[in-house]
Each structure stands twice: as C-alpha cells, then as structure tokens.
A protein has these predicted regions:
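Catalytic nucleophile serine of serine hydrolases
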Residues: 80
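Extended, subdomain-level signal for the structured scaffold at the beginning of enzyme domains
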Residues: 1-76, 84-93, 104-150
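Anionic-ligand binding patches
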Residues: 97
Length: 150
C-alpha cells in the first residue's frame, strides 16, 4: 500500500491469478500470472519475503523477470526471503545485499557481499532483512524510484 500512497500503480503477480493469503491472513488479489508479466512494462520489481520465495524461485518465469530487471538496471527491491529469487536467478555476484538471517549463508555462497543491516542499497538494488526493517526498506525503495524516474 505504501507504493500506492506514493502514487504508483501496483500489479501483484504470482504463479496463477486469483487470491493469495499472506502470513497474517490478509488476502491479496493476484492481477497477473507470472507468465503474463512483461518486465519492460514495469519500473520496479518488488520481491516480498515469507515462504513464497521458496516456491517462486523454482518458476522459470519468476527467474526470467528477475534477470530481465537486473540486466536492464531497473530498480529491484527484495526483503526477508525475497532475495532467494535473486540467488536462483544468479544475479547477485559481487552485489551488496542483505536478507533474513537463515538465508544469509546461501546469499554469500551465491557471490553476494552480505551486510547485516536493516537496508542495503547497491545501485538500483534495495534489500532488507525482515518485516521490522520495512520502514527503511520502503523509504529507500521510494527514494530510488524518485531518482529512477528523473
């Protein structure tokens, strides 16, 4: 909702259309299946955390979207377990990043430069560790979008 407050149109994508239920029982409408997403039509890729990245990282469409954003040097924001998708996409080598503590070793093995900070910004890549870091994560994501749109 913070991105919508900042005046951005938001589409939620997942394996298929319909509804998904978040950790605290909130339902979210899925606007597009991953296969329907054209990365060139979007300014920002947000990879939320929780349990979903463990499934999404096995989806070829999710990997292709992440690779396209990183290759195009477009803003990418990942929090908690979200960086697992970037790990599977092979796009973190030499990049500064953070993630949920249980993913940290995997992040390092993928060639990322792990930093245990509430938010890490490396170019147009924004990463955070956990839900408690959301204020810093959102602040940096919105700031980055402001720079990217100029």
């Amino acid at each position: 909702y913070r991105l919508q407050e900042a005046g951005l149109a938001v589409d939620v994508a997942s394996i298929s259309r319909g509804k998904i239920r978040g950790k605290h029982g909130y339902e979210v409408v899925v606007d597009k299946a991953l296969a329907e997403v054209d990365p060139q039509a979007y300014e920002l890729l947000v990879l939320p955390g929780g349990k979903a990245p463990a499934t999404l990282r096995k989806e070829a469409a999710a990997i292709a979207i992440a690779q396209d954003f990183m290759r195009s040097d477009k803003p990418v924001a990942a929090i908690c377990h979200g960086p697992q998708i970037l790990i599977s996409a092979g796009v973190l080598v030499g990049r500064r990043a953070t993630c949920y503590r249980s993913v940290a070793e995997e992040l390092k093995q993928a060639g990322a430069l792990y930093e245990d900070q509430e938010v890490v910004v490396d170019g147009k890549l924004v990463t955070s560790r956990q839900p408690a870091d959301l204020p810093a994560f959102m602040r940096e994501m919105v700031r980055l979008l402001g720079k990217a749109s100029r």
